[in-house]
């Protein structure tokens, strides 16, 4: 299996792997967004992107969890939708991801779990590949984790941290290298522009 970063940026701030081969390394800083990378012992490439948005935490949260509109601002998403909302802290979403020829389009089905307090919101997505039947039109991404952490700095300033990895078959490593940094930069820049 080759690693490919998840185009979803939703998502991210705490580590997903117990054992790490390397620590985070800053790879790019642009538009007040920092993107860090690291590899785990099982050779997954993870990214962590951080920025400050001058808006209250709850407004940013509402924008992020509007998964029916995520495709409008997230990198390479062709479509996005909420499949099932169990309650305010658990629901299921599906994303379809545009891939350049000759690669086949991907889709991802994830659960979304939300934890909140007055100064902190965590939005975690974990792949749930069997939640709905897969389509022949897409190759399903079966292993991914993403997390978005919103941390209140003050009433009008929020730190946003996105962390993610995904594993998909058949993606050459040079493609991974082209997009793993640009994806979170694109998505966080678009998110910031909404405020």
Name each model feature, range by range:
Residues 2-13:
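Sec-dependent N-terminal signal peptides
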Residues 17-195:
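Eukaryotic helix-grip
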């Amino acid at each position: 299996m080759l690693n490919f970063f998840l185009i979803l940026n939703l998502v991210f701030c705490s580590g997903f792997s117990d054992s790490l081969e390397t620590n985070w390394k800053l790879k790019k800083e642009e538009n007040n967004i920092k993107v860090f990378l690291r590899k785990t012992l099982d050779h997954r490439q993870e990214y962590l992107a951080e920025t400050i948005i001058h808006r209250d935490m709850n407004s940013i949260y509402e924008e992020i969890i509007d998964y029916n509109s995520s495709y409008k601002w997230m990198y390479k998403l062709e479509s996005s939708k909420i499949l099932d909302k169990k309650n305010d802290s658990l629901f299921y979403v599906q994303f379809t991801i545009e891939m350049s020829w000759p690669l086949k389009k991907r889709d991802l089905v994830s659960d979304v779990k939300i934890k909140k307090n007055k100064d902190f919101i965590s939005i975690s997505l974990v792949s749930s590949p069997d939640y709905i039947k897969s389509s022949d039109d897409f190759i399903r991404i079966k292993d991914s984790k993403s997390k978005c952490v919103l941390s209140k700095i003050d009433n009008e300033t929020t730190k946003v941290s996105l962390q993610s990895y995904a594993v998909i078959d058949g993606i050459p490593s040079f493609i991974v290298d082209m997009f793993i940094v640009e994806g979170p930069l694109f998505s966080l820049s678009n998110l910031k522009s909404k405020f």
